[in-house]
UniProtKB/Swiss-Prot annotation:
This is Zinc finger SWIM domain-containing protein 5. Residues 156-171 have a biased composition (Gly residues). Keywords: Metal-binding, Zinc, Zinc-finger. The gene is Zswim5. It comes from the Eukaryota. The lineage of its organism: Eukaryota, Metazoa, Chordata, Craniata, Vertebrata. Residues 126-136, 146-155 have a biased composition (Low complexity). Pfam families: ZSWIM4-8_C. Residues 1-10 have a biased composition (Basic and acidic residues).
Amino acid sequence: MAEGGEREELLSPPPISPAKRLCSWPSPQAHHPRGTPGAAGGGAGGGGGGCLAPGARPHLQPESLLDCAAKTVAEKWAYERVEERFERIPEPVQRRIVYWSFPRNEREICMYSSFQYRGGPGAGAAAGAAGASPVEEGPPPPPGAAAPAGSAPGAAGAGSSPGLGAGTGTASGGCGGGEGLPFRRGIRLLDSGSVENVLQVGFHLSGTVTEPAMASEPAVTYKVAISFDRCKITSVSCGCGNKDIFYCAHVVALSLYRIRKPDQVKLRLPISETLFQMNRDQLQKFIQYLITAHHTEVLPTAQKLADEILSSNSEINQVNGAPDPTAGASIDDENCWHLDEEQVKEQVKLFLSQGGYYGSGKQLNSMFAKVREMLRMRDSNGARMLTLITEQFMADPRLTLWRQQGTSMTDKCRQLWDELGALWVCIILNPHCKLEEKSCWLQQLQKWSDLDICPLEDGNYGHELPNITNALSQSASHSPDSLSRPRRTVFTRAIEGRELHWQDSHLQRIISSGIYTAPACQRENERLLFNSHGQPLWLEHVPTACARVDALRSHGYPKEALRLTVAIINTLRLQQQRQLEIYKHQKKELLQRGTTTITNLEGWVGHPLDPIGCLFLTLTEACRLNDDSYMEMSDMNESRLPVYQHVPVASGCPNSNESYLSLALEVALMGMGQQRVMPEGLYAQDKVCRNEEQLLSQLQELQLDDELVQTLRKQCILLLEGGPFSGLGEVIHRESVPMHTFAKYLFSALLPHDPDLSYKLALRAMRLPVLENSSSAGDTSHPHHMVSVVPSRYPRWFTLGHLESQQCELASTMLTAAKGDTLRLRTLLEAIQKHIHSPSLIFKLAQDAFKIATPTDSSTDGTLLNVALELGLQVMRMTLSTLNWRRREMVRWLVTCATEVGVRALVSILQSWYTLFTPTEATSIVAATAVSHTTILRLSLDYPQREELASCARTLALQCAMKDPQSCALSALTLCEKDHIAFEAAYQIAIDAAAGGMTHSQLFTIARYMELRGYPLRAFKLASLAMSHLNLAYNQDTHPAINDVLWACALSHSLGKNELAALIPLVVKSVHCATVLSDILRRCTVTAPGLAGIPGRRSSGKLMSTDKAPLRQLLDATINAYINTTHSRLTHISPRHYGEFIEFLSKARETFLLPQDGHLQFAQFIDNLKQIYKGKKKLMLLVRERFG
């Protein structure tokens, strides 16, 4: 990294001479109290803080030459080198160097004390676009070369305004956007005056911070110590015992006190300087007073050191000089911010152990954002922190478990791994890293990648994307197999980055100057490097080129990233124009065939490197209005929408009026409109959808002004005319990723400005080719052709349900917008009927159209209402022969919709019922609702209209009864009861069907209806037929048909003796349950027959005898049923049922005693039981006790 080793110095030092004082070499132990000496990484830039830099003079009073020199030396040189370089350093110079060595930028304190940071990620880019940033005026150095002086940390200069060149922060919210964050709490402690006793001795700052008293806790004072070097905090110590990745609030408070109130801090030179000025007596007095003040702590150590010093052979006497913890770092020490590595490991391990919970994923994403923030500040701790995070990820025990079980990781975990891999690509493509650093990272990445548990790039699927550095041109001819690569892990793309470099002269010119144009006299090999306007092109695999942009942007080169982005977009434009020309030559042939095998194997949306998202963010950050009050604390958790402005593109073309914002919109549209084949695997397909939604949410933040609308319209026309190369072309590959979600955004954005274009585009996007009939494979000789890998309809489209729902959302959006426009609604209806294949989704659209057409506060839209009805009718036809759990709801809704349309719609569905409904639905729901009193009132029908509806309903009822008498006979009778002829026909249908497949319950139901309507003889006939279909076993005493049997017997009894005599043989034949038979017998003997008979018949007035016909037959059957049931129950009876059995015999005796000789018959029956079942002694004892 930039600060990972010494760069070009301000002065060229002569050969190192011995130090002027041997008692001032720094102590590593003192600098690293937590045991992390020499931590890898580096520090952030020292740009100015949110307030005036410490000791800075008013604007009109320039800094003194001493301060200017001291600031630079304090930032660039270790103090030991200063001492070695100059034999004598005046005390005022020493004081200014020590003074300026403390960090000057509050942002850096915030970065190490908070996950969140509100510094406007586009700060650097915006400044770079305006040409105001003092950072990186030249191109980034190639890997391994020394970076320019301006690229080192703090190159922005101590006096530069916040955000210029060093603006970072990828997480939303304020620096400490929550009350509990250390940075926020540190500011509160500082503002409340809790920081006291601040003392700076050389490169060591100390003080006390008092936590105010709480309701249940007293005030507590903590001692805080901070060591620093070259504008970086190198170690911290606090009495609170904080265990976290970030600095505690007390360290923050002390640091901010030093930044904001430097003049109130007591400043002393390093303690070795003070000791050097003392004579022997003063030194002795100093030591003795020091020991006296802290004798309990330091006396043993003091005596030990004294013994060693007095011993001539001791190790301490073999070394010149003595350590000084306040003298700053040594030359050999790495200059980096303090980062508690152990806490980073512990925190990541803790978050991973929490599984896929939302909170842990959010925290890990915040850590990734912190890495990006460090990278942009060019802080080498970014790479070190990412290494620590990756080590813990690779140590996650779930990786082994998932591999052993053959299961895939969760989506949330997969997304974290993707971000990890993307960050490593940024690290490897760092334009200012050293070759040895890059080599070290690559070795570690290769080691991780070689492990069996290392996650693969796109799951367990073999089809891979092209290699990052050897990606083939999109116009090359390749089959899927030829693009397959060996096992690719999440680190493979970063490892492939070893082949990329920054030394290409054309690339260097692109990123070094915004006005780089084609030379007047071009050589043969230079003609392809520029477009017709002389603007430079960058002809590289698009995702790889975008990875370069991300690396530049991530490492604090905003202007360079913008320049390369513009070159990439010019290249994409040229490619788009060439594809249009190719399509024009093949348009006629493709339209005749109606199909194509041309496709892009690699999509930019959902790509692991997120090329479109990278370009879009780079461009929009250049246009984002920054909030200068980045240090203000916000108690509001909601994030505010960003505000953008047009920033002109720095271009060598004088007539170019483009802005970065319009380019951002254009490249997003080009990327999402790219035709690409659906990738393999659930995760890859889900990632396509998720990435598209992310890009669209970012697009929706743009306020479309005239310039952006013009860009939008132009790009939409190009997409429509793009043929098979555009996802919105006329003919596309059958497996192309659908454009529904994208088209919905385009439709909504374009509608107020160009309705015709918006509808044309949205209607084109409605298709879902993979569900439509495939045609012939076509000509495979074209370089873009790819034979379909979907032999059947859609075997590998795991996200098909989501895609269909997005298709439905697009149609619903158009329906809402087209309200009142008959022609557009008719066109849209045809598109829906052609392209949407899910009945549930069409039903949803029909419901949406119905709601829009029938608002509660305005008149009904008849055209849209008819569209709703048409969609409903299509749903009925689609689901008529299939199972759908919402079918009844759909039928009821359709009748409601037809009612709203009018009586002609109801008549139409009644007349064509057989194409829409099952017989049961037609009679029980459709016809019944159509002729209901509610419908008549709703439509205010006159008599002829009511009769027409009723006639249609009767015709429907008879047709349904003929087709399905079992289910529709009763409904047909109900619908026809007001028309004698139709009623007779329905009754005859029921009688004819009785001998067929109708069940006893259906016949009993119809019979009861006939009795209710006043047709008892017809009811008796149907009941008799029902009895012939019934069979009640001896133990079915709770059968649901018992009530029907009792009702039938009561009906026959009420009609007269003859009807009862006709029914009893049927009862005896069908019913074998003794209790039911005895109940029937009892009921028949209670009243005389014919009491409730039909008019004209008279009752005999005499009760019927059980000894005579027809009851004698029923009595004998009942007694036999009791006998048979008794024997059946005794076969498997248990003691707990003895009491129940005795009660059963008691009921049986009541029936036995009805005839004159019944008591003898019952006694004989009991004796037989005692003889047959004498082995059941306890039971027989109970029988004797009850019955003798």
